[in-house]
Amino acid sequence: MSIMSDKWIREAVINHKMIEPFAEKQVRVKDSEKIISYGLSSYGYDARVSNEFKIFTNINSTMVDPKNFDKYNLVDREVDVCIIPPNSFALGRTVEYFKIPRDVLVICVGKSTYARCGIIVNVTPLEPEWEGHVTLEFSNTTPLPAKIYANEGACQFLFLKGDQICDLSYADRQGKYMKQLGVTLPLT
């Protein structure tokens, strides 16, 4: 497997609409204010988080069960700044819609700006021929409330091209998160 460059990413966007909307270069300023950067980088793409969040709460005294997830574990918010309570968790989604080629696996890593504040971003790999908005998982590991800024950079996607095309893609096996829109909760 090889990690793919900015040139390859740009061509995949032009020829296959791999990322929409697409920022051709790093955006660091918006409306004369510094922001957490997003857009194309040397060997990856920094994606933005939308203003749609689901924040974990204990107001309903439920339990988190991945096989029987209770939507009442969360409160929905559409905000420019999401406040994650201390030692808590929130879900968001990318502004960008991704369409992954059959010979590519995508890995997500967090932005250092958030990591240095104790905010960890987790995303499972984007598999060959998966498409949709990416649901982002934010963990606030600090004993203090933490801010996530909507429409600014949240994570970086790295594109790994396989030496061979896979026999069975995410689309072939009709994966349960195929073509997800918005923040998607656990499915079994």
Curated annotation (Swiss-Prot):
Pathway: Pyrimidine metabolism; dUMP biosynthesis; dUMP from dCTP (dUTP route): step 1/2. It catalyses: dCTP + H2O + H(+) = dUTP + NH4(+). It is an enzyme of class 3 (hydrolase). It holds the Pfam family DCD. DCTP binds at K111, S112, T113, Y114, A115, R116, T135, L136, E137, Q156, Y170, K179, Q180. Its EC number is 3.5.4.13. The active site is at E137. SUPFAM superfamilies: dUTPase-like. Gene3D superfamilies: 2.70.40.10. Keywords: Hydrolase, Nucleotide metabolism, Nucleotide-binding. One of its GO terms (biological process) is dUMP biosynthetic process. InterPro entries: dCTP_deaminase, dUTPase-like_sf, dUTPase_trimeric. GO terms for molecular function: dCTP deaminase activity; nucleotide binding. Belongs to the dCTP deaminase family. Homotrimer. Catalyzes the deamination of dCTP to dUTP. This is dCTP deaminase. It comes from Rickettsia bellii (strain OSU 85-389). The lineage of its organism: Bacteria, Pseudomonadati, Pseudomonadota, Alphaproteobacteria, Rickettsiales.
